[in-house]
Amino acid sequence: MESTRGYLDMELLRFSTAGSVDDGKSTLIGRLLYDSKSIFEDQLEAVEAASKSRGNEEVNLALLTGGLRAEREQGITIDVAYRYFATPKRKFIIADTPGHIQYTRNMVTGASTADLSIILIDARHGVLEQTVRHSYISSLLGIPHILVAINKMDLVDFSKDVYDKIVADYKKMSEALDIKNVVFIPISAKDGDNVVNKSDKTPWYEGPTLLNYLETVPVGHKTVSDFFRFPVQYVIRPISSQFPDYRGYAGRVSGGIIRPGDKIRVLPSGTESTVKSIDFVEEHLEEAYAPMSVTLTLNDDIDISRGDTLVKADEKQPSIEQDITLDVCWFNERPAAVRNKYVIRQATFETQGLIRSINYRRNINTLEKEEGVSELKMNDIAEITIHTANPLVFDKYTENKVTGSLIFIDPDTNETVGAGLIK
């Protein structure tokens, strides 16, 4: 019981891995799991058997990350593969995201909740287009820490000159994109150099190993706003003799804290009331905070529907607009163009909307802002302005990731075609 409680109380670090194809993301995760003794004997036996069936003389640690069978047989990661492990100092959730350019949308999904992003670079190839793309997306998503793991150092004889050039190239790129808090570590995921254990092949490197850095990097606990935000997911009105007059509003707290007696405002209508109770299963809570899912009851019977947002009346209010400027990452093969119409979904709110203007597109190769663009193609990153049929209640993404983000849905196919971060 004590060991279980200790595990639950341990600090959690969520991190994602990203890089170009074959940079060694899955091998790195496999090495972390293997060297930190976070795999079971039967898992290792299965990987050894799979490695032999492929004709590999050594154990292919990339197979430890699992994923779909078809993807493993191709030797690539397509979907986002999540892994969990712990050391005596911290517990971790890893999102292994795809390297192929056509799967950038999966990388956005995997990195959206991360505290840290590991960007892998093949020491033989240096900074590539996908390196820039993944770094820029990590920056847009507000990930507070970026760890650049320069992998396959064994294939360049652990050359300090090669390492220094890649560091210089990355710093030049990161400064142009205003990316901060970057740490560089030379590694060989295949052989384990500087992953968990310090390597004697890089005497010129005096920094931490990759795992040591993951165990000690500050975890940003402030991932949501200090101001109360409660997107209403469902209105509960049970018709029963036990609860004849019950009317509750279910949802997840996406910012701040709420207590019975607090004065709230319903947006976008502006109607006000006070909190009567905070219900969770069959309990009445004294308070609720992010990211708790609860049901609120109010002292007044007012009109509230799914998609409305409850806020505290005496706190900073979110914006309520129909014209919104945001950064967008386009996911779909069908281009986005001015006047194109989409379903806009933000938290529990859904409305029709259209692209009013494409303000600029970021050129990933030159890092310049390209103006006068008529459409966005798959994997383009741009700043656009949209117009919604109904007012949107929102915060900036940097202030609240839930109320500051939205997705674009194709009304014909119901596919998610883009993700937006409100500026």
Residue positions per predicted region:
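Solvent-exposed alpha-helical segments within well-ordered globular domains of core cellular machineries
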Residues: 30, 42-45, 49, 66, ...
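Conserved Switch II/interswitch segment of TRAFAC-class P-loop GTPases
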Residues: 90-92, 97-103, 111-135, 141-164
